[in-house]
């Protein structure tokens, strides 16, 4: 070994001697880091590590000064990673070493120098001492029942195969039952004669202690009086008799349950067979406990139990409108779904999957569906699930096995026809334990789930009466799972909807939660709008509810602190006092017309945004540069806009070779925020034309639309959110693709009235409305 520095692992409960092969369980972070830092030696293609004893057993994170300097250089034979972030390694102790320059922050590391054993000059004397030690160990092993017979056989085999006195001494020392400090002292001793005499002394001491302990135990047993033995046996008989009576009563209860429950034929036969097996078992055996747990689980399921579900779509619609503002299309589809269920007790159509950003009401919609159907609601959280057994259950052969989560939820709600929410179905993953998404296929398929077999139960259970509804934040689902679902997309709330939700739902809810009396606190509409604009940035209303709660608490504190204050009216002026400085800003129109700066419109998870696009030209080679953390699609859109401009350069009074002398740098501010998508094409093109022709862009005009190389304007998404952002930011005119005119019917009237919305089909129309002057034929 040429390497003089290696990772170092501290041991708490063992001292390893050279020549010994030993298993080690690794669980502490520093030890795992040291293990991960090991590298393959160039000499023999093996990994090596240093191991040493720590001075204090109970020290979880010892310092470098709390480690012994005499250690072992070990070859790593095998590494087995365990599921609970630990590992088991098998090492072969190669040599005893002296440590120096021990360092340890994330993992210990040290320099080392091999310590040779002193030479044995009196071989005959050493042979005599070693033979004596081997005989003493055999005697000790026979006397002391604590030493396992297999260990004795292994040690004797190792000793008989070894011709090296040092190896035999190390083998005996490693199996001595003595303190860790004593073993460490043996390891540090370089004289073979001193080490073997110490081993012999320890063995003699162990033999004397063992014989003394055995004699003492024999004397104590003889001192037990006959009356005490009789009393003990009598009490034991009473306990056994009581246990037998209890077992008979318990088995009778199980038998009665089997007869009374509406089990399927298969389940009843299985239960009777398991009960028959249980009667013949020793009630104290482990197998008896496994069988008893199985029967208890099987009989606790709601076999044949159904809630009286009576669907009234008018009542269901009232419940949905009561609990949710807006979401008209979503509620309409849910009512259609319930209408089919009202006419047919079972639905064979696809499973509903509500997809949308956090906080838009997906979970509460499912609760309202359950209430509207008159069924119990249960939730199965699938986020982070990566084990197939959590869906299908564990087989009985495994220790601690149990049924899957599907049957676990039915057991919890005590009915076979609940509404079950499969929450965060897109957050499942897979690993070596299987793919839970594949396990869900049988659960969600109406043609198969009436014969669902849990691995633990091993009998069929009918899931066809369960209404499964899934939720997800992303539409990126496994193909097979996606095919079994009808996706209903729930977009983020627009500002007006958030205002109505806050005024009609969130404020009353927070007042009720904080026990606010009538007329004690009022929150103005402008204050709520400022909360939405400057203190939250989200698709849903969770953060808005938290901020309203914070406002309520601040106001309540003032009322309770000052008895003269009877009423607090919270308006926009109170927000910074109660909640601190503004957290966010929404985009505003430019203050004046700019050259090379255009206002685009973006659609994000949290709504619409104004997107400023600016450009500069400077001497160069005709290249285009983009900054602002733009995605690949947006970069390609910029290239398309530049190519379209170059092809029309003569239309703007520019020569074909003008652009060759300039580089154009396009930047989209808020550089830390990723931006992507093709809908900024119009704005990018307008920015380049304005820059090169020196014609300003109207500051009150915003635009959205993808462009082609031929200058056509293509449709975009998120029109509603983009128009809302334009109205909020002081924009007067918005240019939209002609193909998006059909989407204007979904835009609130107040938004359409506040904006001049112009449809365009090509970039010439865009430039006509966007630029202060016209560059055509200049």
Swiss-Prot record:
Which cellular components does GO assign to this protein?
cytoplasm
**Which residues are recorded as binding ATP?**
356-363
Alphabetically sorted, this entry's keywords are: ATP-binding, Cytoplasm, Hydrolase, Nucleotide-binding, Protease, Serine protease, Stress response
Pfam families named in the record: AAA, Lon_C, Lon_lid, LON_substr_bdg
Q: Which reaction does it catalyse?
A: Hydrolysis of proteins in presence of ATP
Subcellular location per the Swiss-Prot or TrEMBL entry: Cytoplasm
For the biological process aspect of GO, one term held by this record is: cellular response to heat
Q: What is its EC number?
A: 3.4.21.53
Q: What is its main location?
A: cytoplasm
Q: Does the keyword Nucleotide-binding apply?
A: yes
Show the active-site residues.
Answer: 679, 722
Residues covered by the Lon proteolytic domain: 592-773
State the conditions that upregulate or repress this gene: By heat shock.
Q: Where is the Lon N-terminal domain?
A: 6-207
Q: Which GO terms describe its molecular function?
A: ATP binding; ATP hydrolysis activity; ATP-dependent peptidase activity; sequence-specific DNA binding; serine-type endopeptidase activity
Check the record and name the PANTHER family matching this protein: ATP DEPENDENT LON PROTEASE FAMILY MEMBER
Q: Which family does it belong to?
A: Belongs to the peptidase S16 family.
Assembly, in brief, is: Homohexamer. Organized in a ring with a central cavity.
Function of the protein: ATP-dependent serine protease that mediates the selective degradation of mutant and abnormal proteins as well as certain short-lived regulatory proteins. Required for cellular homeostasis and for survival from DNA damage and developmental changes induced by stress. Degrades polypeptides processively to yield small peptide fragments that are 5 to 10 amino acids long. Binds to DNA in a double-stranded, site-specific manner.
| Protein name as annotated | Lon protease
Source organism: Rickettsia conorii (strain ATCC VR-613 / Malish 7)
């Amino acid at each position: 070994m040429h390497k003089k520095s290696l990772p170092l692992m501290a041991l708490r409960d063992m001292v390893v001697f050279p020549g010994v092969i030993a298993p080690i369980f690794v669980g502490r972070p520093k030890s795992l880091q040291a293990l991960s830092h090991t590298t393959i030696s160039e000499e023999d293609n093996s990994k090596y590590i240093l191991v040493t004893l720590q001075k204090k057993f109970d020290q979880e994170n010892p310092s470098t000064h709390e480690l012994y300097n005499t250690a072992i250089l070990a070859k790593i034979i095998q590494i087995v990673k365990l599921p609970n972030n630990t590992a088991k390694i098998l090492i072969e102790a190669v040599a005893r070493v002296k440590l120096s320059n021990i360092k340890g922050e994330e993992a210990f590391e040290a320099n080392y120098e091999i310590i040779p054993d002193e030479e044995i000059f009196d071989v005959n004397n050493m042979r005599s001492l070693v033979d004596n030690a081997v005989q003493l160990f055999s005697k000790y092993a026979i006397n002391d029942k604590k030493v396992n017979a297999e260990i004795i056989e292994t040690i004797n085999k190792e000793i008989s195969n070894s011709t090296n006195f040092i190896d035999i001494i190390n083998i005996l020392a490693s199996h001595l039952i003595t303190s860790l400090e004593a073993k460490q002292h043996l390891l540090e001793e370089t004289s073979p004669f001193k080490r073997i005499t110490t081993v012999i002394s320890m063995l003699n001491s162990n033999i004397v202690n063992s014989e003394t302990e055995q004699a003492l135990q024999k004397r104590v047993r003889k001192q037990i009086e006959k009356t005490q033995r009789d009393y003990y046996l009598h009490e034991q008989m009473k306990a056994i008799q009581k246990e037998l009576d209890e077992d008979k009563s318990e088995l009778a209860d199980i038998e009665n349950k089997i007869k009374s429950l509406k089990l399927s034929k298969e389940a009843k036969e299985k239960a009777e067979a398991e009960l028959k097996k249980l009667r013949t078992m020793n009630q104290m055996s482990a197998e008896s406990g496994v069988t008893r747990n199985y029967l208890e689980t099987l009989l606790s399921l709601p076999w044949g139990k159904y809630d009286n579900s009576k669907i009234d779509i008018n009542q269901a619609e009232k419940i949905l409108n009561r609990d949710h503002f807006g979401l008209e299309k979503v509620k309409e589809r849910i009512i259609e779904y319930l209408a089919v269920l009202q006419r047919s007790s079972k639905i064979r159509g696809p499973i509903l999957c509500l997809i949308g950003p956090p906080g838009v009401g997906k979970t509460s919609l499912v609760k309202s569906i359950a209430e509207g159907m008159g069924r119990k609601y249960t939730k199965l959280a699938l986020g982070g699930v990566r084990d197939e057994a959590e869906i299908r259950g564990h087989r009985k052969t495994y220790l601690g096995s149990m049924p899957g989560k599907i049957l676990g939820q039915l057991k919890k709600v005590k009915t076979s026809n609940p509404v079950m929410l499969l929450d965060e179905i897109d957050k499942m993953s897979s690993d070596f334990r299987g793919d839970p998404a594949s396990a869900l296929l049988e659960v969600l398929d109406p043609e198969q789930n009436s014969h669902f077999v849990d691995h633990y139960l091993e009998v069929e259970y009918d899931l066809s009466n369960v209404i499964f509804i899934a939720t997800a934040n992303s539409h990126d689902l496994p193909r097979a799972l996606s095919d079994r679902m009808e996706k209903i997309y729930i977009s983020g709330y627009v500002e007006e909807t958030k205002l109505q939700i806050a005024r009609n739902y969130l404020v009353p809810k927070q007042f009720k939660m904080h026990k606010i009396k009538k007329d004690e606190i009022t929150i103005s509409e402008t204050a709520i709008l400022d909360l939405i604009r400057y203190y939250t940035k989200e698709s849903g209303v969770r953060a808005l509810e938290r901020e309203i709660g914070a406002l309520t608490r601040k106001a309540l504190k003032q009322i309770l602190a000052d008895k003269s204050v009877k009423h607090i009216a919270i308006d926009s002026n109170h927000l910074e006092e109660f909640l601190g400085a503004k957290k966010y800003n929404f985009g505003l129109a430019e203050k004046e017309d700019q050259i090379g700066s255009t206002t685009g419109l973006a659609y994000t998870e949290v709504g619409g945004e104004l997107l400023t696009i600016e450009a500069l030209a400077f001497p160069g080679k005709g290249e285009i540069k983009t900054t602002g953390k733009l995605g690949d699609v947006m970069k390609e859109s910029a290239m398309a806009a530049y190519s379209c401009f170059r092809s029309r350069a003569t239309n703007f009074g520019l020569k074909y070779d003008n652009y060759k002398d300039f580089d154009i740098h396009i930047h989209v501010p808020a550089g830390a925020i990723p931006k992507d998508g093709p809908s900024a094409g119009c704005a990018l093109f307008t920015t380049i034309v304005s820059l090169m022709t020196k014609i300003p862009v109207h500051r009150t005009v915003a635009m959205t639309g993808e462009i082609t190389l031929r200058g056509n304007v293509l449709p975009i998404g998120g029109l509603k959110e983009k128009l809302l952002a334009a109205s909020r930011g002081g924009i007067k005119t918005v240019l939209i693709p002609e193909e998006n005119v059909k989407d204007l019917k979904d835009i609130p009237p107040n938004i359409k009235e506040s904006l001049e919305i112009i449809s365009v089909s090509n970039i010439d129309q865009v430039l006509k409305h966007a630029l202060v002057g016209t560059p055509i034929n200049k």
